[in-house]
Swiss-Prot record:
Keyword RNA-binding: no
GO CC terms in record: cytosol
Alphabetical list of Pfam families matching this protein: ASL_C2, Lyase_1
PROSITE patterns: FUMARATE_LYASES (PS00163)
Group of enzyme by EC: lyase
Cross-referenced HAMAP family: Arg_succ_lyase
Lineage top rank: taxon: Bacteria
Pathway the protein acts in: Amino-acid biosynthesis; L-arginine biosynthesis; L-arginine from L-ornithine and carbamoyl phosphate: step 3/3
E.C. no: 4.3.2.1
Subcellular location: Cytoplasm
Catalytic activity: 2-(N(omega)-L-arginino)succinate = fumarate + L-arginine
Keyword terms of this UniProt record: Amino-acid biosynthesis, Arginine biosynthesis, Cytoplasm, Lyase
Name by which UniProt lists this protein: Argininosuccinate lyase
Organism annotation: Bacillus cereus (strain AH820)
Length: 462
């Protein structure tokens, strides 16, 4: 077939060269955005008198027809037409005649594709924010059910201090809240229009870029035509934000994997989110959590890939930028899928409160409570720390725990120890006393839950 840009060429490319250069196999995902962008563009052309109202109406009817066909997956794309833009333009001309060729007046594929991706990410970022809020709602429900579920808090994967399981869950709520905030802020950069920037230098036609942007639901235009067609920082920002979100999901999945093991037995995954072994009948593997953890590297790779593509590109457009899309599409699909799986996995998991409770009665995670006890009685904390360290050593040598040490032995270490010491050794009491802002104390958790519920309700309302 003859190319829409083929006027200055005398030889046709080999089929394998065409296939190598074509992007229609993946950029067809932009079909809705491409057609909607074209409808806005031709509407503007008519308003400015660049095409007649009759021509614009004919073009819009043709585009609306193609849009409906696209929604029903009835469009047939060709490699010969290279990309989504030329495929749609070719179909339009076939449908309505040569007047369809006027659609591209005052526009280049360079600003067209950038516009498509802005519209695509606008939609997808809003979807991801909503899905993240749904996951946060699941976290809130689990936290509400586990305010008084006591578990070990860890540093260096060693038991450190007793905490509420709700407090642990809510830590991820706030990480996700920052992820949502980052996505929301990125919409300021996504919701601007490159349309009308042309190939790189603008156009000689009297277009109205602000009007086109308004028709597309965007909040403004790029101020520089070179910048509009040549940068992909809005995609990089999306990939960066998605990498951080996936990192948070991956960290939580790592813990879920550990907690579901026989060594911990803190939780049990629903059968819906686990798999078995082809050889070992007893196995119940946390495959979905492992897959989310694994797919995190995939999203990181998409970020690093585009950063590497961009780092050496002179202004303005270069064909290298064709490589900006597949990683973006893949990241959207990956993040949406992981959020959906994560929400279901957390909603259906069983919490083994008894095992968590046992874990904080057979360790030394209450050692800090004794140091605080002495400090509250006026002893410098460093001296209190030294005394408690010796008490822990004494216990490990005897094979006992701090609660088993008789008061007489405590008094040998410090005369400040009294009978009330044993009250602070209870994990429940230890958690309850940590009532500083943002702490694991039950009162603080109730406050955090109220705030968290308010944030999720507000998001659902919007």
């Amino acid at each position: 077939m003859s190319k829409l840009w083929g006027g200055r060429f005398t030889e046709e490319a080999e089929a394998w060269v065409e296939e190598f250069g074509a992007s229609i196999s993946f950029d067809q995902q932009l079909v809705n955005q491409d057609i909607n962008g074209s409808i806005a563009h031709v509407t503007m052309l008519a308003k400015q008198g660049i095409v007649t109202k009759e021509e614009a109406e004919k073009i819009k009817i043709g585009l609306q027809y193609l849009l409906e066909e696209a929604k029903q997956n009835k469009l047939h794309f060709s490699v010969e037409a290279e990309d989504i833009h030329l495929n749609i333009e070719k179909m339009l001309i076939e449908k309505i005649g040569e007047v369809g060729g006027k659609l591209h007046t005052g526009r280049s594929r360079n600003d067209q594709v950038a516009t498509d991706m802005h519209l695509y990410l606008k939609e997808k970022v809003e979807h991801i924010m909503k899905a993240t809020k749904q996951l946060q709602t699941v976290l809130v429900h689990q936290a509400e059910n586990n305010i008084e579920t006591i578990m070990p808090g860890y540093t260096h994967l060693q038991r450190a201090q007793p905490i509420s399981f709700a407090h642990h869950i809510l830590a991820y709520f706030w990480m996700l809240e920052r992820d949502v905030n980052r996505y929301e802020d990125s919409l300021k950069r996504i919701n601007i229009s490159p349309l009308g920037a042309g190939a790189l230098a603008g156009t000689t036609f009297p277009i109205d870029r602000e009007y086109s942007a308004e028709l597309l639901g965007l909040n403004g235009i790029y101020e520089n035509s070179l910048d509009a067609v040549s940068d992909r920082d809005f995609i990089l920002e999306f990939l960066s934000n998605s990498s951080m979100l996936m990192m948070h999901l991956s960290r939580f999945c790592e813990e879920l994997i550990l907690w579901s093991s026989q060594e911990f037995q803190f939780i049990e995954m629903s059968d819906q989110y686990a798999t078995g072994s082809s050889i070992m009948p007893q196995k119940k593997n946390p495959d979905m959590a492992e897959l989310i953890r694994g797919k995190t590297g995939r999203v990181y790779g998409n970020l690093f890939s585009l950063l590497t593509v961009m780092k050496g590109l002179p202004l303005a457009y270069n064909k290298d930028l064709q490589e900006d899309k597949e990683g973006m599409f893949d990241t959207v699909k990956t993040v949406e899928g992981c959020l959906h799986i994560m929400a279901g996995m957390l909603e259906t998991m069983t919490v083994n409160k008894e095992k968590m409770g046992q874990a904080v009665t057979q360790d030394f995670s209450n050692a800090t409570e004794i140091a605080d006890y002495l400090a509250n009685k006026g002893l410098p904390f460093r001296q209190a720390h030294e005394i408690v360290g010796k008490l822990v050593l004494h216990c490990t040598q005897k094979g006992i725990y701090l609660v088993d040490v008789p008061l007489a032995t405590y008094k040998e270490m410090s005369s400040l120890f009294e009978e009330d010491l044993y009250e602070v050794l209870s994990p429940y009491a230890a958690v309850k006393r940590r009532n500083s802002a943002g702490g694991t104390g039950f009162e603080q958790i109730e406050k955090a839950l109220e705030k968290a519920k308010g944030l999720t309700k507000e998001a659902i309302k919007n």
